[in-house]
Amino acid sequence: MMEERPSADEVLLIGKVIDAFGLRGEIKIRAITDQVDHLRRHVRTVFLGEERRPFTLQRVHEPKAGILILSLGGVTDRTTAEALRGAEVTIRECDAAPLDQDEYFIHQLYGLRVIESGGGEIGVVREVVQTGANDVIVVERQGRSDTLLPMIHDVVERLDVAAGQIVVRLLPGLIDDDNQEG
């Protein structure tokens, strides 16, 4: 029986195919996951491309950080593997490693309401920028320019994905009030 293809909302991006590897149909991906051991031990199916074609994950090898070599069921020669170049590689969100209490998936932040701890609404998360040190959310504010808020404990009091909101403590100078004159 063929694996049902998940919707775009049900998958997480783990990488992108950058090339074929070897002659036996393995693919090389640039990974954006640090959960390689979980991928190796617990994930049985990956999905490739916009159409999210299912492939059985047979083997995962990490020759260096950020690069994975995958063996996929049905991909047995270099020509077939080369045809997958450029495809996004996803897994079902339910197959991902469980998150710790203070962790989140980036896609979960989009569209959340950002509320000041005093109760006033600041705006809605439009974009997430990954800086390496910490994530930064771009908050779209009605009638004002967007603002950037770092996702750090000093600023974020509560992140409640289920309630659709992020409650923040505004540190002095964190938001530019556009210097609007009355």
UniProtKB/Swiss-Prot annotation:
One Pfam family this sequence matches: PRC_RimM
InterPro entries per record: PRC_barrel-like_sf, PRC_RimM, RimM, RimM_N, RimM_N_sf, Transl_B-barrel_sf
Keyword Translocase annotated: no
GO cellular component assignments: cytoplasm; ribosome
Keyword annotations of the record: Chaperone, Cytoplasm, Ribosome biogenesis, rRNA processing
Single GO molecular function: ribosome binding
Subcellular compartments: Cytoplasm
GO biological process, one term: rRNA processing
Source organism, top-level taxon: Bacteria
Residue ranges occupied by any PRC barrel domain in the UniProt entry: 101-174
Cystines in this chain: none
Chief localisation class: cytoplasm
Record keyword Cell cycle present: no
Assembly and oligomerization: Binds ribosomal protein uS19.
Summary of the function given for this chain in its UniProt record: An accessory protein needed during the final step in the assembly of 30S ribosomal subunit, possibly for assembly of the head region. Essential for efficient processing of 16S rRNA. May be needed both before and after RbfA during the maturation of 16S rRNA. It has affinity for free ribosomal 30S subunits but not for 70S ribosomes.
NCBIfam families, A to Z: 16S_RimM (TIGR02273)
Family from the record: Belongs to the RimM family.
Record text about domains: The PRC barrel domain binds ribosomal protein uS19.
Record's protein name: Ribosome maturation factor RimM
Organism: Roseiflexus sp. (strain RS-1)
